[in-house]
UniProtKB/Swiss-Prot annotation:
UniProt name for this protein: UPF0262 protein Pden_1958
Native organism: Paracoccus denitrificans (strain Pd 1222)
Superkingdom: Bacteria
Region (Disordered): 1-22
Family: Belongs to the UPF0262 family.
Length: 162
């Protein structure tokens, strides 16, 4: 596990207002959380001349009033920041991601490896697009590397209806 202070040490997902995820999405979410906790890069920039308490940080993700909420606390639980992102920029990418995931899960059951690989490449491309969008939307609020953004995008998909 990365021991840098610029990381997430805990991730909570508030999906209490949502229907239960499919087994595949639930598995994606578990893997994303595990991978995030194993290795991530998450930095909060100072704002308006104020220093930010050093990490590691605990992240609570939720959707409230059609906005994605990042609630950030220190490892000990002291609130550090909260910011809200519009879901609009993510909606089409999330929809495309769910569609390609459905195709991928179906393909795994019945298609030859070459066709599965082609669908998986498309799935990864859409996933990367979502990660880049997330990095752009987090600009000035939090800095994350592409791998962290990819895993966070997976968690966003678990919170946003496709």
């Amino acid at each position: 596990m990365s021991q840098s202070a610029n990381r997430l040490c805990r991730i909570d997902i508030d999906d209490s207002a949502l229907p239960p995820p499919s087994p595949e999405i639930e598995q994606d979410r578990r893997v994303a959380v595990f991978d995030l906790l194993e290795d991530n890069s998450f930095t909060l920039p100072g704002r308006e001349g104020q220093d930010v308490p050093p990490g590691p940080y605990a992240l609570a993700l939720a959707v409230r009033e059609k906005r994605l909420v990042f609630d950030i606390a220190t490892e000990s639980g002291s609130k550090v920041a909260e910011f809200h992102l519009s879901l609009g920029p993510f909606r089409q990418t999330v929809k495309d991601y769910f569609q390609i995931c459905t195709s991928y899960f179906d393909a795994v059951k019945r298609l030859p490896p070459a066709q599965i690989e082609a669908i998986d490449m498309a799935r990864r491309g859409i996933h990367n697009e979502g990660a880049r969008t997330l990095q752009e939307r987090l600009e000035g609020k939090a800095e994350v590397d592409i791998d962290t953004a990819r895993r966070l995008f997976t968690l966003i998909c678990a919170l946003v209806p496709g």
